[in-house]
Structure formats: structure tokens, C-alpha cells
UniProtKB/Swiss-Prot annotation:
The keyword Coiled coil does not apply. This is Putative cysteine protease YopT-like blr2058. The active site is at residues 109, 223, 238. GO terms for molecular function: cysteine-type endopeptidase activity. Residues 1-14, 137-162 have a biased composition (Basic and acidic residues). Signal peptide: none annotated. GO terms for biological process: proteolysis.
Amino acid sequence: MYNRVDGEYAHTEQAEESSWPADGSECAQTLTEIARLESLAPGELFDRMGLCFSKPHTSDAIDDSSNTSGLSTSSLSSSSELSVATSPVRPLFDYRTAELPQANVSGICVGLAAEWLLDLPSSASSRMGVLLPGTENHRSAARRQEQSEKLKTQLKEDKAEGSHNFQAKSTILRDAGLEPSAEETRYRFGTSSCIDKIVNELAQDPSVHLVSLKFVQPGAGTHTIATATSNGTTILSDPNYGEFTVPSDRVGGLFKSLAERYSTLNKRDISAVVTQRIRYGHPNATDLALFPRAEPHR
């Protein structure tokens, strides 16, 4: 059973635990290693991309009656913020710099993330505005998502080796003018040491990442977000909620708030975070530092 408070697994999740080594590298693995350990075909890993969801864009007020664990504090801490088990989790929308209402209702998070990466040189409000339903960028995101799904289907039919989702996703990113890494890394989510490793990667300055959130609940699928870091600031784009901005040393707190939002309001608990680094090769922004420096929430 998964414990929302400390992010650890009890005996019912032994199959999940067995996929992680006990040699000190338990926080991070490449997807090919995960496939070997779990005796799964690599193409079956994270092939549910695009199954996205969100509650309406309401306030972050939490109905305690719906929270069976009585969760009001969290120990999903990051040492970068010197959090302790009793520290409250900051409401996610405190970090938000731009909204993105109703853009992902059809589950096109991969396409929306790709479009966001292409528009990094713009301002936060502009980046979100061009992704709203009815815009050309939103239609383009839907086409990219459809292309990804068709590629995955074709790869499965051809019995191609490797992760079908990873290959399809990388193809649409390259077609968009981006340069995705040839490898993904999966991090266990929940303990402070593992969250620190996620933060250390995403907060590298400068860097751009496509990030997949894997959930504990069976059939919950995987949700895709994106991050960009430059000049000591990290921007996170979640197609369900919008854009969030923090100083890079506070990325851990942002992820805690994101996890709390999905857990409390969507009943989805993050079990793993999968990262893929993107070299920003878009012709309109050859230097990542060109993207506008939004004023972080303090």
C-alpha cells in the first residue's frame, strides 16, 4: 500500500519495489535498466503518455473531509529548502505566473509540452495564451499528439525494440526542431534524497527537460510536463494548470506542491518522475538564456 505522507511503499507494492536496486542507486535508473529488472518489454514502459487529467482551475482550498489520510503536512522534503516533516506544503497556485485553462481536456500533454518548449523566448502570458483551445498552437499540439500515438502503434505492430513511447516522443520533438537526449532517467519519488536528485537535474543552469509523472494508482497513466532553467530561475509548464516560476533552489518545494495538488484533488499519487533532457535547438532561440526572466513568486 502506498503511504501518501512519507512516499514509501508497504508490502502490497513489493513488485514495484523489486524494480529498484539496493546498491545506493535506488533513486535513479535508465528506462532500459527498469525494463530488464521488471522483465517487461521496454515498449510497455510509460506507453500511456497523454492520459492526462486535472480538476477545474479552482482555488487550492482543500476539503479535509475528502482526505482520508488527514494530510495537512508533508515529509516529501527537499534538503535544498531545509524542509522538515512538519513543514506545510505551499499551495501550488502560489507559484503560478500564467494560467492555461481547459487546454488539456483531450489529453494532449506531450504535444502541449512540445509547443511550450518551442515558444520559450516569449513571455509567460504569451506562452500560455498561444496554447489556449482554438489557437493554431493548440491545434498543432493536438496534431503532434496524434502523430506520437500513430508512431507508437506502428512501432508496436513492427515489434520494434526499445520503448515505443520514447521513440515516438523523441521523433515528434525532433520534427519540432528540438534536440532530445537519447536517454531517459527515472527517479523514485517520495523520499527527500530522491527528490534532491530530481531537483539537481532540473535545476542545472541552463537546461531544458521534458518530464513525465508516473502515478501509483493502476490505470492512472502518465502525465507530461516541461521545465526550463536559466539565470537561477526555473520555469515549469504543466498543461493541466499553467506555468509556474521559482528560484532554482526552490524547485523541490514546487514539486512537493505539485504532488500535493494531484494527490489531494485528483487522487493521484506520484510514484516516479522520468526526465529527458532537451537541447534547445530552436532557430529563434539558439541560447536558452534568451527566454525572458519572469519574476518568481517569493
